[in-house]
Amino acid sequence: MAAMGPKTEQMSHRAARSPFNRFKHFPLALCLSAAAMWLGAPRSGVAQVSYVARFSLENPTYLAGEPIFCKFTIQNAGTQVFSFSYRTPSRALNPDLESEPRFSIRDQQGRSLPDPAPKPCGGAKGTTVYGSVRLPPGQTHTERWLLNQWAGFSSPGRYRVHAERRLPLLAFDVSKPDISGPPVAYALAINELALEIAPSTPDQLQKAFQPYLKTLEKRAGPEAGEALLVLATLPQPFTLKKLAALARAPAAKRGLDRQQALEGLARLGTREAWEEILKVARGLQAAPPNSLPAAKPEEDSLRAYAVLLLGEKGDAAFLPALLEMLPSASETPRGEALRALGLFNDPRANQALFETLRSPAANDRVNSVLGLRNLGSKEVIPALIATLSDPDAQVRQVGNFALQGLTGQKIRLPQNASPAASQHTAEQWHAWWRKQGADFTAIQLPPCRDW
């Protein structure tokens, strides 16, 4: 069905007692498509922005543990070229971004399935980089979204998917290189879809993953990126070697997101998977001497991400390796290791953080302060107050930031504060600590991920 006219959006809805009864009376997908908005006054010869947009499932039945893709299509049904934002279809950390699809999944009893997405660290919603798509009249654009990123279909049964998207459409002007400006219309798609999950055997599941494993042999192109997303979202014991190989591949040869491969190993969660992450953290996949100049920063960034995962896991078995790498690691993984030490809540880690507060390197002192903040203990308050006397201005600012985060107090340290002003702020903190320290409970940071 379609609604025609300026800024018109219509959708019919049929009430039903059971969430699945509606599918007995009309097609499985409740499709909303619209043709909306003329540019200028509605007169003959004026180009019209018109579209048809919908979600659909590729199959009615899937095996338990199998990747489930929901397809989004938009067709330019008008006479005006339009553009819209586009990126590789993977779930964004920020759910409030305007162009992103939204999925909610319920079981046969109407219960919402748990959302497996990680909570934004420290409340940050992250950023997303978009490209753009130019869609001439008559052409269709298609995206495949992996539904397993929004729900874990762990049990056989019937499920209902509510899929929704409101995509801003921009007028395309060949004389202008960018597509900035207000939308001329919004492509709205709202669909109710149903699927069934059937029991699976290990052999069936391994067969279902073979196309993705074969695609990853190419290590390039959007198909390989989609295959890696599948393995990282739904890791299986038989995908361990492939994920480990992708994570440890030299930067110049990878062509794929190695951090995503590390996430897949962490999500798999076996002892062997975590050992592979530890190897990356220790730099055992270091770039060869004749690698490109950009390789070492990329390797350092990858090592730092592996260290972060180890910290989020918080297993004391990883702690000796992190402590061992502190003296020799380069700045990026070393800084991540110091911050991660606070996540272990272990006396050995705490001692290393307190000792590093006396490091001659200001960056080390900054990261030690952040590590103590991650510890989330009132015992670190005196040491953090002492950082307000540090000779480095950044250390003082980060120290005050950590104190605010631990206590909830709004004692401010002005930007570019002089040592004298910092000392005044330190005196305010000392007064607060003497008055309330005995009864104070530190504010705990929620975990970013539960590996």
Residue map of PLM features:
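The feature marks short-to-medium sequence segments in extracytoplasmic or secretory-pathway proteins
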Residues: 84-135
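Internal, hydrophobic beta-strand segments that form the core of beta-sheet-rich folds
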Residues: 141-171
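Short inter-helical turns and helix N-cap capping residues of alpha-solenoid HEAT/ARM repeat scaffolds
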Residues: 220, 251-254, 285, 299, ...
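Asparagine-centered strand-capping/turn motif at beta-strand->loop junctions
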Residues: 74-78
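Amphipathic alpha-helical scaffolding segments comprising HEAT/armadillo-like alpha-solenoid repeats
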Residues: 202-213, 236-250, 270-293, 315-327, ...
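Short beta-strand elements
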Residues: 172-209
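Low-complexity, acidic Ser/Thr/Pro/Gly-rich terminal tails and inter-domain linkers that flank the onset
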Residues: 45-63
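Residue-level detector of extended alpha-helical repeat arrays and alpha-solenoid scaffolds
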Residues: 224, 254-258, 300-303, 334, ...
